[in-house]
Amino acid sequence: MKRLILLASALLALPVLAAPPVPVSWSLAGQWRAHDGNDPAFEGWRGTDTHWRKLRVPANWYSAGWDHQGALWYRTEFSLPQPAADTLATLEFDGVDYFADVWLNGKRQAKHEGYFQRFAIDITGDLTRYNRLAVRVDSPFEDPKTIWPLHKKQVKGILNQHDSRPGGAWSPQGQDANSGGIWAPVRLRLSRAVAIDNLILRPDWSQGLDKPTLSAELVYRAPADVQTTLTLTAAPDNFTGTRYQQAFPMNLKATGDTPQRVAVSLPMPDAKLWWPVGYGFPHLYQVTATLRDDAGVLDRRRSRTGLRQVIEQPDNKGWTVNGTRVFIRGTNYIGSPWLSTMTARRYARDFALVEEMNANAIRVHGHVANRSLYQQADERGLMIWQDVPLQWGYDDSDAFADNAARQSREMVAQFGNSPSIVVWGGQNEPPFNSPWMEKRFPDWHKDLNRVLMQRVADALAEDKTRIVHAYSAVEEHYWAGWYFGTLQNLLEPAKTAIITEFGAQALPKLSTLKTIIPRKDWWPASTEPGDPKWTSWKYHNFQPIQTFKNAGLSRGNSMASFIHNTQQYQADLVALAAESYRRQRYQPVTALFQFMFVETWPSINWGVVDYLRQPKAGYYALQRAYQPLLPSIDPVNVQWKADQPGQIHLWIVNDQPSGLSGARLAWRVKQGGKLLEQGEQPVTIPADSGNKIVSLPVTPEGTQPLQVESRILDAAGKTVADNRLRIDVLPR
């Protein structure tokens, strides 16, 4: 039976489709048909729909209910009247994971590789009144013995290998729950004589912050030369203000099979700037590029952007946005390993929690997300460190390096209009920088993926409007207290200006945990990682070795105590680390990113928010430690001894662009019910500063924990920031 998508019912009454007064676009979302495509002899572009099943588009096939590895054929039909002679028909895919082989009416149209890119296909010559569209989508299972995980061949980052996805990073099940599919919108676009495939926007600050120029590049296709006028308009999107517009007469050259580019510049004197959260309003402009001839509109493309200047100052002096220094209080973020499940509303929910935690930035860790993420961050003023989707090891060939560099350029071109993206980050923990891999992989060598890293970094560096971080090095991952060392190490001087990972695991609340671990595996007989009941826990990302051996945690006698112990440890660690590195602001620390913000599936990992979006104790600890104005407490040592004197240093750290005069710092130190120390001191707090205010000599009496409280009061006596710390005391 024919299944027809009605693109525009009003048009079906016409014998031909007249050239539209404006470009038109129709979504092809809905119930498509799908069939296993792993048999290479099966030609899914033809034949009947017998034995095909319904599958929703857009969706990752796993989230749509089909747990599948490898290839699927997708098919749908749609109808429309025969277009007019000068009409260009474009099929646009916003994201197909991972390989796409596209057929229309029995003819192969194009192949594409890459899960996150929008790609356009000219189908003008093959479009008819009744059309059958077929797509073979292949998200390959990579052989664990020869390819995965050290020599991966897909640029998918955390989507096909990571500690936080089903099965974990290194187990044979680490590729479970494949993310493949037509996961982002598909549409048919009709234009006249020319098609605009992309509008690339970048700010030019050569005339100063008060006289920005918007540089615009159109990526277009035209079968013949076109005499046209390009009108570029930048109108306020989320505020009321000046609208900027300019017309550019031009002759667009015929492109053939390769899209071409044309560049123009729009002066925007006194334009409103995009500011990050805590520093101002994130002004956004809706930019429209319209091509016209004497008969009307040929094509139009819109994109939203904001004007902001980002600079990484030398010598660890910090990052500036629009000339103002900004200290980065960040967190690593993955919304879901199945990107189609993350809607604008869900990103807004997550980012509200991020902001309430007092973070001003996220690191989109090891993947490119769906476009709603960047739209939400743009609107909220939430800064983004955007990684390329390269996690650990890959094919070391020149061909793969070229492929990864190409995809990195496409990321920059397609997502670079978002002002929230302030950093392009390269490969995460590349093998040449990960000597620990030598013990795990016999074929590891000290230069593995060094060329890949450099080619990707060079591709990212072509964007001169952002900070580029060539790769996320293991030296920037401060895992003391979890993978090595102790909490005490977190109080030591930092060795890098940028800290892109720190944290610890914690169990979620009991009601959430019950949805993750089967009842039969609820309580393993021992804490030894070889106990078979830990297998289910490890599949859901829990790390018994790090929990019980490295961190030295106890389960206690109940699940309630187990949850409490892990959450308390995570809370202590993230707060201790965050405060320590904030006290080291610009000496040398300029940016820090806790790992991770949220658990992405029914998992037990490093998230301070569980997969049901219920905060753990670590969330509230980080919320205190990330206060823009922070009365920080430095215990000097994490464990004290009874009856031995120690020192507590009280600091004020102010990330805000404004200071506070006439303030007071007040404190008290208690042990049990006894007050050991109390006082206050007048302070003037400079903007963008961090200073040690007072050192307190304290001698604990017995082994009860010390409770330290510190708060900042304004000139009216109102508490504007407060903090607390528990210090464990050991017997002498």
Language-model-detected regions and their locations in the chain:
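Secreted/periplasmic carbohydrate-active enzymes, especially glycoside hydrolases
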Residues: 1-2, 6, 17-364, 573, ...
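N-terminal signal peptide c-region/cleavage motif recognized by signal peptidases
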Residues: 13-15
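Substrate-binding clefts and catalytic carboxylate motifs of secreted carbohydrate-active enzymes
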Residues: 24-27, 32-42, 167, 174-181, ...
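Short, solvent-exposed loop/turn segments at secondary-structure junctions
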Residues: 97-98, 140, 431, 475-476, ...
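Active-site mouth of glycoside hydrolases
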Residues: 119-123, 132, 142-146, 152-160, ...
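Alpha-helical structural signal in soluble globular domains
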Residues: 290-292, 376-382, 414, 455-463, ...
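Active-site proximal loops enriched in glycine and acidic residues that flank catalytic Cys/His/Asp
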Residues: 366, 386-388, 425-428, 470-472, ...
